[in-house]
């Protein structure tokens, strides 16, 4: 009986500690971004500062802390990631995410803006 109670206590402690440390809920891709939103992170693996973009914002020139510094992202919307000079663009679809976007394509280190919808919606670059 003592061994059984000890095992229950140990397992319960591990379970509680994993919740406290975020071990069971630490992966934001399990939840994803809400519909119509994109989460941008300043560090890889969904860490660091987080910027929440909502498609109702329309065209968005990234804030200084994220311009040329999108290390990871989770998308709940179809959006276009844009670099104006030289012109580059990447179509991102709802449900897409990258833990280390800057290293994967190196585009996160060059990104200037977000536009809702498809990259084909871009007519010309802003000057």
Curated annotation (Swiss-Prot):
Top-level lineage group? Eukaryota
Give the record's keywords alphabetically.
Answer: Glycoprotein, Secreted, Signal, Sporulation
Compartments in which it is found:
Secreted
* Statement: the UniProt record of this protein carries the keyword Zinc: no
Q: Which cysteines are joined by disulfide bonds?
A: none
Q: Which residues are glycosylated?
A: 54, 118
According to its UniProt entry, one GO biological process term is: sporulation resulting in formation of a cellular spore
Its GO CC terms are:
extracellular region
Stretch forming the signal peptide: 1-25
Q: Which family does it belong to?
A: Belongs to the Dictyostelium gerABC family.
Which protein are we looking at? Spore germination protein 3
Which species is this UniProt entry from? Dictyostelium discoideum
Q: Which gene does this sequence derive from?
A: gerC
């Amino acid at each position: 009986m003592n061994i059984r109670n000890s095992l229950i206590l140990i397992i319960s402690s591990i379970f509680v500690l994993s919740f406290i440390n975020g071990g069971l809920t630490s992966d934001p891709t399990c939840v994803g971004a809400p519909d119509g939103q994109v989460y941008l992170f300043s560090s890889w693996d969904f860490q660091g500062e987080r910027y929440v973009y909502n498609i109702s914002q329309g065209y968005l020139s990234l804030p200084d802390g994220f311009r040329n510094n999108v290390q990871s992202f989770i998308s709940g919307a179809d959006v276009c990631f844009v670099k104006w000079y030289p012109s580059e663009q990447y179509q991102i679809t709802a449900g897409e995410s990258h833990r280390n976007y800057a290293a994967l394509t190196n585009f996160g280190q060059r990104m200037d803006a977000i536009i809702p919808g498809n990259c084909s919606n871009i007519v010309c670059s802003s000057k």
